[in-house]
Design a protein with these regions (language model features):
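Extracytoplasmic Ser/Thr/Pro-rich, glycosylation-prone low-complexity segments
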Residues: 1-264
Length: 264
């Protein structure tokens, strides 16, 4: 072996390996339709995300991607690579946004005059993404006007084991603004290591009483010049029931494996 361990054919030796899986560095993605099989229930039983964002048209507080689920001290924190940058934190927008633009946690808005905690309920007039006039460096999961101040909840959970954990963010029975009898339930799942994003849509209603019912399901980079959306779901009128989609980086997963000898 390259590290100098020599093995004798008549000797029993025990080998172990450390596998290091760095985040991917790609800015290219593909979209896939996948079977509708949510990894957990939408009302997860842990209301952590409500503490981060539980109001109408507001950004929550910056949070660790393993918020409420601290790992073993010997296990790295949950991180996610998004357009070539690795993030340990994010911030939730009440209208279906997950933003990695947290360097200025008091001003997550394209319109500072509206107030720095204001999560704009509509940017549809700016057109489809990619678009510098829309929220950037974020996941639109989907992005449209939901009103959590009158009902519903946002749930958060980490499932699985390192290095294959999943961060689940679930928008559960959120009333549509101007159509409060219509309830939206959907979740976004982030995979560490592979940096895959999955969307599970139990029910995404259409409310044409507000902004003609326009909504966007996809991602956009920090510059606003690259974006990926589900076909037909880019600043358009669409509804979904029991659908699932995946956005995954293009390219092979890179890893490093270090072998070492240990005693029996």
């Amino acid at each position: 072996l390259n590290n100098g361990i020599q093995l004798q054919c008549n000797d029993n030796k025990y080998l172990a390996a450390d596998i290091f899986l760095p985040g991917g560095g790609t800015d290219q993605h593909v979209v896939e339709s996948i079977p509708y099989n949510p990894p957990v229930s939408y009302n997860l039983g842990n209301s952590y995300a409500s503490q981060l964002c539980n109001n109408d048209d507001r950004w929550g507080t910056v949070f660790s991607l393993n918020y409420g689920f601290p790992p073993d001290p010997n296990i790295p924190n949950f991180t996610f690579d998004f357009y070539g940058v690795t993030y340990p934190q994010a911030v939730i927008g009440a209208n279906g946004l997950i933003s990695f633009d947290y360097t200025n946690p008091n001003c997550f808005t394209q319109n500072p005059a509206a107030g720095c905690t204001f999560c704009q309920y509509t940017q549809e007039g700016s057109g489809p993404i990619p678009n510098t006039g829309r929220y950037r460096n974020c996941i639109m999961a989907p992005y449209y006007h939901i009103n959590f101040s009158i009902g519903g909840d946002i749930y958060f959970q980490i499932i699985g084991e390192y290095p294959c954990r999943k961060m689940v963010l679930s928008y559960y029975q959120g009333p549509m603004f101007s159509c409060t009898s219509l309830l939206a339930t959907h979740m976004c799942v982030l995979y560490e290591t592979s940096n895959v994003i999955e969307f599970y849509l139990q029910n995404k209603p259409i409310c044409t009483a507000w902004e003609d019912g326009l909504a966007t399901l996809g991602i956009q980079n920090a510059a606003g010049n690259q974006g990926v959306t589900i076909p037909g779901y880019n600043n358009s009128v669409w509804g979904a029931t029991n659908e699932a989609w995946r956005i995954k980086p293009v390219g092979e997963l890179e890893y490093v494996m270090n072998w070492y000898k240990r005693s029996a």
